[in-house]
């Protein structure tokens, strides 16, 4: 996974090898030099890095709460928990047709001492909100949350394409 560009205060590239239990983080040391951090960790089978929206699309309708894990890098790798719960349905429109999307809230659960101290210091990660269109082929509709630890809240929405009419198309 690569985090680079104006949205990321601390650019980094992360490689995760679950079977070997190896996490490698390439980051900047603050002086322009590359810093490589390698950790050997026991990684859980429910690791959701890079697959959160795929996971949400595959949750059965009516799920009460689902737990998963995520690896965060600051740049030191550490595991956090994800508590995923459906918050009902919201109505939206595509081409003037009303549809319902399941609204999910993903809470990041910090572990250990960090999890105890973060709320006292106002450093709890914000919730991630995601909307998934249910059906035979579930689809991502919208998300709102940070793209990286400590980053700003971003809203990403599905944009319906509009194709030009071509008189000579056959």
Tell me the role of every PLM-derived stretch:
Residues 25, 39, 43-44, 50, ...:
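N-terminal secretory signal peptides
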Residues 20, 31-32, 49-52, 61, ...:
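Low-complexity, compositionally biased segments
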Residues 36, 51-54, 61, 103, ...:
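A general, composition-driven signal for non-globular sequence regions
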Residues 1-20, 63-170:
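Acidic, serine/threonine-rich low-complexity disordered tracts
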Residues 49-57, 91-95:
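Short acidic/polar alpha-helix capping motifs at helix-coil junctions
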Residues 1-46:
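An acidic-aromatic
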Residues 26-30, 53-60, 100:
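Short, surface-exposed secondary-structure junctions/capping segments
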């Amino acid at each position: 996974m690569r985090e680079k560009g104006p949205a990321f205060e601390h650019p980094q590239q992360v490689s995760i090898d679950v079977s070997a239990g190896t996490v490698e983080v390439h980051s900047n040391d603050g002086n322009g030099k590359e810093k490589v951090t390698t950790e050997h960790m026991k990684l859980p089978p429910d690791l959701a890095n890079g697959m959160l929206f795929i996971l949400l699309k595959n949750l059965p309708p009516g799920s009460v709460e689902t737990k998963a894990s995520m690896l965060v890098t600051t740049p030191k790798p550490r595991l956090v928990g994800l508590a995923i719960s459906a918050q009902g349905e919201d109505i939206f429109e595509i081409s003037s047709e009303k549809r319902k999307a399941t609204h999910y809230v993903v809470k990041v659960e910090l572990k250990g001492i960090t999890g105890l101290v973060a709320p006292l210091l106002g450093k709890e990660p914000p919730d991630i909100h995601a909307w998934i269109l249910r059906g035979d082929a579930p689809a991502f509709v919208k998300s709102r949350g940070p793209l990286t630890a400590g980053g700003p809240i971003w809203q990403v929405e599905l944009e319906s394409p509009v194709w030009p009419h071509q008189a000579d198309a056959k």
